[in-house]
Every structure is written in C-alpha cells, then in structure tokens.
Amino acid sequence: MTTDDDSAPFGRSLCAMVTPFTGSGALDLDGAQRLADRLVARGCDGLVLSGTTGESPTTTDAEKAALVTAVREAVGDRAALVAGVGTADTRHTVELALAAEKAGADGLLVVAPYYSRPPQDALEAHFREVADASGLPVMLYDIPGRTGTRIEPDTVVRLAAHPRIVAVKDCAYDLLGTQKVLSRTGLAYYAGCDEQILPLYAIGAAGYVSTVANVVPELFRAVLDAFDAGDTGRAALLQRRAVPLVESMMAAGLPGTVTAKALLGALGLPAGPVRAPLRSADRETTAGLLAAYGELAADAGQSQA
C-alpha cells in the first residue's frame, strides 16, 4: 500500500523493523507477523523490512522474500511495505528488487553500494538501473557513515527526474544538502536518524524511518501529530523527551539492531538474537535500556495524568 499523497508516498511514520529470529537463529516469521501487526496498530504507516536494522547483510535472498510475504499477510493493506534490496552488486540488487516486487512489497529501499566506493556517475547509473528494473517506487538510502559513499545532493537532484525515484532516507547529517534537494525537487525526504525527526520535518521532510519505533511506535508519531496541529512547543517537548532512550539505543556504542532487539526481548516482544558478526547485548546494557524506556514511559504517564 502506497499513499495517494506524493509528498509522503509511503506515509509519514515508518519503522525500520528488526528481523525476528528464533533462539537458534532461524528466521521467525510468526514473530515478524506479530511484531508488524503491533507496530501498525500503534501508529506506523509503513514498515521498512531488511534494512540496516533488519540485518540485511546476514539474511539470505530467500529469507528476505519470505519476510515480505509474511508481513504482507499480517498487515494487509494497512501499511506500506518498503523492502531493503541494496547490496554492493548492481546485478544482485536488481534480483532482490524483482523478488521483493513479486513477494508483495510496495516500494524499494536502495542503499548506496558499499565497499567499492563508486564515483558519482557510477552511483547514479546504479540507481537508475535498479529503478528501471521493476515497477516499484524507490527510496534512495543515503548513509555514508556505513557505506563509505555519499549520494551527493547534485546526484540526488538528477536522480529525482526518474519517475520511480520518489524518496530519500536521509542519514547523511547534512542539513544544507537536504534543504538543497528539497528546494529543487519533489522528492519525499524521510529522517533516518531518530534525533533528527523533528528538525527535518520542520523544514519539509515527509516523515521518518525510525529504529526506536520498534519499541515505542507511538512516540514519534505524536511528534508529527503535534507539529501538524500547530503545537510546535509540544512537538519539541516530545522530541526532547525521547533523548535518553534514543541515546541509549543509538549512541551508546552498539548498533541500533542490537539495542532494539535487546529491549524488545526484555519487554517480551518478538526479536530474538542478532546474527554474527553482531553480538547480542549483555545484561548490563539491557538493564540500561530498560531504565531509559521506563523513564520515558513514566514521563508519558505523568503528561497524560
């Protein structure tokens, strides 16, 4: 399900969903369905599957397709499903894009090819080839801290002319570059870093793709709702209130995949272990995450009292 709103083609509130595994490390499709249903019921317009948080480097092609199929069965047309298909290999990325389309995805998340560090003209050609290969809309994924390659703003502007390149997941930490693209294209920008959700929304972003939303899907939806209602003070308060949990999950030295799964597991929700080379969080880390979560829950309860 994509929306009729060109400014937010996949909705506003998206979760970068973890990929649940069983205790032995096998794909847990039942857990994925239960988690997806919970996220959508609590305010997510869309789910990004097999992204960074979804451990895409360590899931097989068959697992990626099976995950899309299972989650589609769980959420029906209540949410947009954006499938992560980006790899370091253009041919492989095209294969994954076609498989995701067949499995029922609504869109594709395509990260810049990593490790080989292609120049901008090669990067542009890569994205065009992937976008040409299927009928699904594409969300570019700019996360140079992980890929080693920036999708430069001028490259994004050129790619915006492609009819199926409709959005960007922005993890570049370049506010000027983001504004440059927003001012020159109709691309929908999605904040890919939880601490930047309100700042980017305030300058015209479509919404967000959040890792923290795995645990608190209502939180950042409330930020956007307050801003849309004209209550910018409350929007800012809610964004600041999230800082301890965002810091614990995203800025404490561990990948968000690890912390999200640890906290979900501690709360009795589907998650399971991470796959190697990642390692699951230890008890001390999990206790700290629970403390930050409890603080946020207490603050929310007081504000509603």
Curated annotation (Swiss-Prot):
It is an enzyme of class 4 (lyase). The record marks 52, 115 as: Part of a proton relay during catalysis. It holds the Pfam family DHDPS. Keywords: Amino-acid biosynthesis, Cytoplasm, Diaminopimelate biosynthesis, Lyase, Lysine biosynthesis, Schiff base. The keyword Zinc does not apply. It catalyses: L-aspartate 4-semialdehyde + pyruvate = (2S,4S)-4-hydroxy-2,3,4,5-tetrahydrodipicolinate + H2O + H(+). Disulfide bonds: none annotated. Transmembrane segments: none annotated. One of its GO terms (molecular function) is 4-hydroxy-tetrahydrodipicolinate synthase activity. It comes from the Bacteria. Pathway: Amino-acid biosynthesis; L-lysine biosynthesis via DAP pathway; (S)-tetrahydrodipicolinate from L-aspartate: step 3/4. The active site is at residues 141, 169. Catalyzes the condensation of (S)-aspartate-beta-semialdehyde [(S)-ASA] and pyruvate to 4-hydroxy-tetrahydrodipicolinate (HTPA). Belongs to the DapA family. This is 4-hydroxy-tetrahydrodipicolinate synthase 1. It comes from Streptomyces coelicolor (strain ATCC BAA-471 / A3(2) / M145). The lineage of its organism: Bacteria, Bacillati, Actinomycetota, Actinomycetes, Kitasatosporales.
